[in-house]
Structure formats: structure tokens, C-alpha cells
Amino acid sequence: MQVSTAALAVLLCTMALCNQFSASLAADTPTACCFSYISRQIPQNFIADYFETSSQCSKPSVIFLTKRGRQVCADPSEEWVQKYVSDLELSA
């Protein structure tokens, strides 16, 4: 009976360590960040969706997803970017 208790204890410790390891990996998961913005306005009909970058990024950004599957970094303080985001929210 002691062997099965010891085996159970080892199993529980192993599971706890695995959970800690996977939790730390999830916290370090890379996120999409922008280091520069597009210099010109892109046509709104090219845009399919958008998301905002993580607060962990050094530069706040909006990333537009085009209908062709490309990601375009844009400055969230630009008026056209705010309009596109607003329009996408209304159409969702």
C-alpha cells in the first residue's frame, strides 16, 4: 500500500510541475506588435477585420486584416484608423 501512496504522491507532484510549466509558457506567448505604421491611408474596402495590439507592445497599434490575408499596422490616433475601427464595430 505504501508503494501506491508514494506513486500517487509522485504523480501529483509531476502534474503540479507540468501545470506550472504550461502556465508560464502561456504568459510568455508572443503577441503581435508593430514597430512602424503604414504611411498612407489604405482603401476601406480592402479591410476585412482588425485587432488592437497588446499593452505589452512598446507602440500602441491597430492591426487591420485585409481581405487578402495581410496584416497592416496603423496608428490608432489617425482619424481614418478610428473611422475604420468604428465602421467595423458597427458592422459586426
UniProtKB/Swiss-Prot annotation:
Signal peptide residues on this chain, from the entry's feature table: 1-23
Cystine pairings recorded for this chain: C33-C57, C34-C73
GO MF term list: CCR chemokine receptor binding; CCR1 chemokine receptor binding; CCR5 chemokine receptor binding; chemoattractant activity; chemokine activity; identical protein binding; kinase activity; phospholipase activator activity
GO BP term (any one): positive regulation of natural killer cell chemotaxis
Matching Pfam families: IL8
Taxonomy, superkingdom: Eukaryota
Annotated GO CC locations: cytoplasm; cytosol; extracellular space
Intracellular or extracellular location(s): Secreted
Function summary: Monokine with inflammatory and chemokinetic properties. Binds to CCR1, CCR4 and CCR5. One of the major HIV-suppressive factors produced by CD8+ T-cells. Recombinant MIP-1-alpha induces a dose-dependent inhibition of different strains of HIV-1, HIV-2, and simian immunodeficiency virus (SIV).
Subunit details: Self-associates. Also heterodimer of MIP-1-alpha(4-69) and MIP-1-beta(3-69). Interacts with CCR1.
Similarity section: Belongs to the intercrine beta (chemokine CC) family.
Protein name: C-C motif chemokine 3
